[in-house]
Amino acid sequence: MKGTIKPGGLAALTISALLTMNCTSDKTSEGYIGPSQIEIKDGKMTPEALLAFGRLSDPQLSPDGKTILYGISYTSIADNRSCRNLFLVNADGTSPRQLTRDGKSISCARWCNDGKSVAYVQGGQIWKADVRGLSGEKPSLVRRQQISDVKEGVGEFKFSPDESKVLYVSYVHSNVKTPKDSDPSLDKASAYVAEDLMYRHWDHWVTELPHTFIADFSKGITRENSTDILAGESKLYELPTEPFSGLEQLDWSPDGKYIAYSCKKKTGKEYAFSTNTEIYIYDTGTGECQVIPMGGGYDTNPLWSPDGKAIVWLSMARDGYEADKVRLMAADFTDGSVSNIRDLTADFKYNAAGPLWDEDSRSIYFNALAEGVQGVFKADIDGNISRITSPDVWCDYDSPFAVLKDGDNTTLLASWCSMDFPTELVSIDGKSGESRQITDENGHILSQLAPDTMEARMVKTVDGKDMLTWVMYPPQFDSTKVYPSILICLGGPQGTLSQSWSYRWNYRLMAAQGYVVVMPNRRGTTAFGQDWCEQISGDYSGLNIQDYLAAARELKAEPYIGKMAACGASYGGYSVYYLAGVHENTFDCFIAHAGIFDEKYMYGETEEMWFCNWDNGGLEEYSYTPGQMGPAGDGKTFGGMVQGGSPWSDNAKAKRHYAHSPSENVTKWNTPILCIHGGMDFRIPYDQGMAAFNCAQMMGVPSKLIMFPEECHWILQPQNALFWHREYFDWLDRWCK
């Protein structure tokens, strides 16, 4: 964002600021959480050590290319919360320094064009502050000003290139009603009223929807002075798309005249059964909107080229299939019109993610999971693709967030992690791919931990294919001794066991407790081409289960492997429940977190119906006609989608799928099992875990149920996370050691 702040923009607003608050931030605020000074005993990683790591995120390069602004969250177990503050580091990795020490989290921090001030979100509003001592050892924010006054709150924001306008995300009421909507005096009544699907999503009842607004700085950032991008629509859509999308779904054109955005313009049943989001071009002057005509599935993350003559975005071809191949699409943009739409990754085997234009507007950097690790790639506008980072480096790279040029030399700035260390910033040579870590946020903790060892093993499947299986060995591993082991059952089901770092399913932590951790990339994983990924749809109980058993039996044949557990979450929980009925004494205990137990009930109680509809029916029986609407109650079509994966479908794959639900095999359960679930899990509702536990009890199987009433599909509160880990390892140790 190079350029001058124009009159009437952000600079002018500082003269007539909405609200001027504290003048400086060089002191520590009440509620501040700083870096942990934990001391590790005997080099053994513990759950407490895992929660002590600082979590680095959202790096932003300054306009002059010299300084990176980023955030780090620290956790207080005692306070049961985390707090995110801002940091700086020179782009070459020198002089890391802390910028804020606030007691309230700061998010969405962005450089202003002058390179001397930043804007950010805190307490649901946008703030601006100058950076004092930018290049010094103790920088701070001074002259803080609240520059928005949106009573509904602000989630994220994005400046226009000249900073005269801002996009921001706030909320509007939805079609899900509460008693107060009909009678304000019923302020103590609690109920939700819905007359269509999508009344709840992920972890919340959908009583409000995100909308994106445009505000002119000269008029003040208030709801009254803002334009809702979706104001002209006849129905209540969401922008950005729930539950995880943000302003990466919207992008300003370089001249500020247009906004490209991604939106699923569907509601209710149509929304629940479709993944069809489209890319729209919004004219900020006229309010008119045009769509890039793609159809099909997800179209997301539009990004203008620096010269404004092209747009790229990510795209899936098929509606209703959330694990379709992710293509990197491009289109020319001339005189307000889109033309020459093309797939830059037509000959690329893997899923593209995180595109970033080179400043020459001729090439795009992106990342992709490829053969078990996530690397950085480069595509030119003609679709020629090269790999930047080496597949021999066992790390997962996020997509670059900035490109630095020095003559013919190109340096990419990105972040990376592995199963051995959490996210850190890294610089990548654009030609050689050589990488150099430029932050060391958690070195003081990692240096205290005893090292593990890792193996990439190719396991033969029952049909003779090679399956990448990561194996992590405990510190001081001795092949003459016998160790307990854990088989990891991946969620998704379409995902990948790559070199990622997790704060719950942390394999280094598991290995540190003395376990050999076995991680098969079974059928359905996404880093090995679309055929390997798509095989699992309609075959949950089939080849991928045999893949798990093949990996388990190969490892158990090793003299150093003793007892073995199978553990997994979400679809991994389904796998655990299914294996419990077919494993023939391969495993000594099971742990299922947020798993699917009964497929028929799952179809009727989850929220994103497209997932079950596709995967339960398989690809061959899937059918969709754009605009098709079935009559209510015909049991076959809703919202334009044929119910090919429903329990009442008459296709062969759906019938087989439901016949092989884990709940059908409970009479064969004979192995101790721990069932864990969150009470606010609306993806796989908590009664699935309760039913599995109840059935285990009725079968006389040693079993335990742990229910977190305030957690969703993930366990996020620090004390709950600590308890989760303690119970997890207590169960493993009880039955495997």
What residue spans do the PLM features occupy?
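Predominantly five- to eight-bladed beta-propeller fold
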Residues: 29-33, 83-84, 171-235, 262-265, ...
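Cap/lid segment of the alpha/beta-hydrolase catalytic domain
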Residues: 441-563, 569-570, 604
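Asp-box/WD-like beta-propeller blade repeats and closely related beta-sheet repeat scaffolds
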Residues: 123-211
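Conserved beta-propeller blade repeats
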Residues: 53-68, 103-119, 151-166, 199-212, ...
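Short loop/turn segments that connect beta-strands within beta-propeller blades
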Residues: 90-94, 130-134, 217-221, 283-287, ...
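Short glycine/acidic-enriched loop and turn motifs that connect beta-strands
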Residues: 74-78, 173-176, 266-268, 317-321, ...
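Beta-strand-rich domains and repeat architectures in extracellular enzymes and scaffolds
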Residues: 48-84
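Active-site-proximal cap/loop segments of hydrolase catalytic domains
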Residues: 519-737
